[in-house]
């Protein structure tokens, strides 16, 4: 039964969700997201879409855990072993868990780099992104004055997605992504 349970968890069939009512758990080191594609991609917009998905997942988890971050890092892995993975780091002006702020800061740092890799036909095969510091307070933010409004909007989106399934409400930028059998279930049900 353990194998079936593990398969259902990996493939998302268990419909596991992070519940905001559970205040007992808080990650010690932050939250992260990683994705390896079945094939490398030189489509910069698809790579940016994959980053958007990762940032949406990280921000969703931060909101659920009641944490914020101002520093993020990760790496970009390539299809060929000729190119080593590239580490990156970006910061937001203040602690936040608002997807828009994190994505905008990420693109300021990585958009040209991704475009450059793709123009040089350096196929990107994997992405990883994580928080590097955390704030567990709910202190008002002086840099993002509209954070309360955004927080309410994202909490409503989170509730809809928790109720009706992940991806029921999503951003347009996360719809354009790397094509192929990138999900465990897709690779193993052929």
Please identify what each model-predicted range represents.
Residues 86-190:
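Acidic, metal-coordinating catalytic segment for phosphate/diphosphate chemistry
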Residues 1-121:
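DNA-contacting surface of Y-family translesion DNA polymerases
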């Amino acid at each position: 039964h353990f194998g079936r349970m593990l398969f259902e968890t990996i493939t998302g069939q268990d419909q596991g969700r992070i519940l905001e009512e559970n205040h007992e758990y808080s990650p010690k080191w932050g939250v992260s997201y990683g994705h390896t594609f079945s094939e490398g991609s030189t489509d910069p917009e698809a790579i940016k879409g994959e980053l958007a998905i990762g940032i949406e997942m990280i921000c969703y988890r931060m909101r659920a855990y009641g944490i914020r971050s101002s520093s993020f890092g990760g790496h970009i892995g390539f299809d060929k072993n000729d190119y080593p993975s590239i580490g990156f780091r970006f910061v937001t002006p203040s602690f936040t868990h608002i997807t828009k702020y994190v994505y905008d800061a990420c693109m300021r740092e990585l958009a040209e780099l991704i475009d450059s890799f793709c123009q040089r036909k350096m196929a990107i095969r994997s992405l990883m992104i994580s928080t590097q510091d955390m704030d567990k307070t709910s202190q008002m933010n002086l840099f993002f004055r509209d954070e309360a409004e955004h927080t309410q909007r994202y909490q409503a989106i989170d509730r809809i997605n928790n109720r009706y399934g992940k991806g029921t409400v999503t951003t347009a930028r996360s719809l354009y992504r790397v094509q192929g059998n990138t999900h465990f279930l897709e690779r193993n049900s052929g």
